[in-house]
Structures are given as structure tokens and as C-alpha cells.
Curated annotation (Swiss-Prot):
InterPro entries in the cross-refs: Tetraspanin/Peripherin, Tetraspanin_animals, Tetraspanin_EC2_sf
Keyword terms, alphabetized: Cell membrane, Disulfide bond, Endosome, Glycoprotein, Membrane, Transmembrane, Transmembrane helix
Signal sequence bounds: none
Taxonomic lineage: Eukaryota, Metazoa, Chordata, Craniata, Vertebrata
Chain ranges passing through the membrane: 24-44, 63-83, 94-114, 236-256
Function statement: Part of TspanC8 subgroup, composed of 6 members that interact with the transmembrane metalloprotease ADAM10. This interaction is required for ADAM10 exit from the endoplasmic reticulum and for enzymatic maturation and trafficking to the cell surface as well as substrate specificity. Different TspanC8/ADAM10 complexes have distinct substrates. Promotes ADAM10-mediated cleavage of CDH2. Negatively regulates ligand-induced Notch activity probably by regulating ADAM10 activity.
Topological domain spans for side Extracellular: 45-62, 115-235
Gene: TSPAN15
Residue spans, topological domain Cytoplasmic: 1-23, 84-93, 257-294
UniProt modification remark: Palmitoylated.
Subcellular location(s) per record: Cell membrane; Late endosome membrane
Matches recorded under PANTHER family: TETRASPANIN (PTHR19282), TETRASPANIN-15 (PTHR19282:SF159)
Protein name (database record): Tetraspanin-15
Length: 294
């Protein structure tokens, strides 16, 4: 090969290496910062929650979920940053495999949830009922439930009768809340003052007799129907979750391939090693500590 062509090939190889390195560093750094932000928000929310803590269930503590998500994102992304800066093949492979495993688990989870749709709905309804039992004791769940009921015009998990699980709304309770639902279940007229007693004495009534006073459909079905009707938003959410992970796996795979090629080319073209030691260097290039000098 003429010298000019050889130099051009080396330049193109070097350019692709630098482009992939830059892309992977930016990718990892962005998600590292996002992970740190999520972790910080989760810690702050948990500190605030501890002031009023009465429950132990992680389902009822979004702060715990944020902390776990933030820790995973922070650690995995830091591995990606370190691996891409140091060209550490072991860390690069670990980063790629972790992203790939997370992506596969999410895909399998989504498929299983669709196949066992009824069981998934029952699982959600059971968890909502457990949250309703402690509605007035856990501020996190109360805020989430109130928001969902107002925005999606629904009441309870399966239906409005789920509120009988709460000790204050149970029809056998002695207080004024007995047999009622929270005011966030009520039909609202924005021009009128909010009537917090609008849902009283409704749980023991038939659906037809209260459907003009409160929302009778459950929030689980209401949210699922909303996503079904707004499938473009649902598709966007799924792409927003899955596409970055797929992009990370692809970038890391291409970068690993390029680093391995450059390690081999560097060893051969420099003529520093004999035939007997070349294989050993190639084997070391796929190990945990071989870095290409920059």
C-alpha cells in the first residue's frame, strides 16, 4: 500500500476512535450527572419524609425509589466515564453488559406485563388498596393519590369502593368520614368553592346513584385507558427509556472494537514486539488493565 494511502487509513482509524471516545464520554457524563441529581432529590425527599414517617413499604415511599434509581444510574454511569477516559476494556465490557442486562430486563418485564395483563392490574390494585389503608398516615402516597384522582377523574384503585379499606372511610367507622371518599374523587366545578364533604355517604351506594357526584371508575383502568388513547405519548415514553440504553450499548460495543483494533495495530506497526510476544499482547488487550496510551 502506498505511504499516502496508509497514512489516510491511520488518520481515519484515529478519527473514528476519537469520535467514539468523545461520544461515549459525553453520554456517560450526562447520565452520571442525571444520576447524581436524581440521587440528591431522593435523599432530600427521604430526609423530609423521615419527619413524618409512619410506613415502611417502599411502594409508598417514592423517595426510596428515587434513591435506588439514582444510585444505580450514578454508579453505572461513573463506570462508563472512567472506562471511556482510560480505555479500560474490562470496565468498558462491564458497562456494556450492565446496560444490556438492564435493557433486556425492562423488555422482558414489559412483555410479561402485557401477557399477564389481568394479573398486573390486580397487583397494582392490591398495592393501591394497601396505600389507601394508610392514606392519612403517608404524605407521599396521599399527594400522589390526590393528584391521580383529580387529573384522571377516577377514584380508588379498582373503583370508589376501595376507600372502604381505610379505617376512617369504612362504613362501620364512628367519625364523619365513614362511608365517604376524599373530595378529590368528586366532580368539580371550577367556578365554585371546593366542598370537601362532597364525597360523604357514597361508598355504600350503587354506581348509578353516585356517578353524578363522584368518579366511580378506578384509577388503574383510568390511567391505562389514558395511555391507550394517547399511544404517541406512551411510545415516546418507552423510546425515552429504552433508546438511550440501546444507544449506550451500541456506542460501547463499537468503542471496544475500535480500542482492540488500535491496540493490535499499534503493537504491530511500531515493530516493538516479536512474533512470539504478539499473541500475549493481544490477549492482554482484552483483559482488565490494558489501556491505549493517548
Amino acid at each position: 500500500m502506498p505511504r499516502g494511502d496508509s497514512e489516510q487509513v491511520r488518520y481515519c482509524a484515529r478519527f473514528s476512535y476519537l469520535w467514539l471516545k468523545f461520544s461515549l464520554v459525553i453520554y456517560s457524563t450526562v447520565f452520571w450527572l442525571i444520576g447524581g441529581l436524581v440521587l440528591s432529590v431522593g435523599i432530600y425527599a427521604e430526609v423530609e419524609r423521615q419527619k413524618y414517617k409512619t410506613l415502611e413499604s417502599a411502594f409508598l415511599a417514592p423517595a426510596i425509589i428515587l434513591i435506588l434509581l439514582g444510585v444505580v444510574m450514578f454508579i453505572v454511569s461513573f463506570i462508563g466515564v472512567l472506562a471511556s477516559l482510560r480505555d479500560n476494556l474490562c470496565l468498558l465490557q462491564a458497562f456494556m453488559y450492565i446496560l444490556g442486562i438492564c435493557l433486556i430486563i425492562e423488555l422482558i418485564g414489559g412483555v410479561v406485563a402485557l401477557i399477564f395483563r389481568n394479573q398486573t392490574i390486580d397487583f397494582l390494585n392490591d398495592n393501591i388498596r394497601r396505600g389507601i389503608e394508610n392514606y392519612y398516615d403517608d404524605l407521599d402516597f396521599k399527594n400522589i393519590m390526590d393528584f391521580v384522582q383529580k387529573e384522571f377523574k377516577c377514584c380508588g384503585g379498582e373503583d370508589y369502593r376501595d376507600w372502604s379499606k381505610n379505617q376512617y372511610h369504612d362504613c362501620r367507622a364512628p367519625g364523619p368520614l365513614a362511608c365517604g371518599v376524599p373530595y378529590t374523587c368528586c366532580f368539580r366545578n371550577t367556578t365554585e368553592v371546593v366542598n370537601t364533604m362532597c364525597g360523604y355517604k357514597t361508598i355504600d351506594k350503587e354506581r348509578l346513584s353516585v356517578q353524578n357526584v363522584i368518579y366511580v371508575r378506578g384509577c388503574t383502568n383510568a390511567v391505562l385507558m389514558w395511555f391507550t388513547d394517547n399511544y404517541t405519548i406512551m411510545a415516546g415514553v418507552l423510546l425515552g427509556i429504552l433508546l438511550p440504553q440501546f444507544l449506550g450499548v451500541l456506542l460501547t460495543f463499537l468503542y471496544i472494537t475500535r480500542v482492540e483494533d488500535i491496540i493490535t495495530e499499534h503493537s504491530v506497526t511500531d515493530g516493538l514486539l516479536g512474533p512470539g510476544t504478539k499473541a500475549g499482547v493481544e490477549a492482554a488487550g482484552t483483559g482488565c488493565c490494558m489501556c491505549y496510551p493517548i
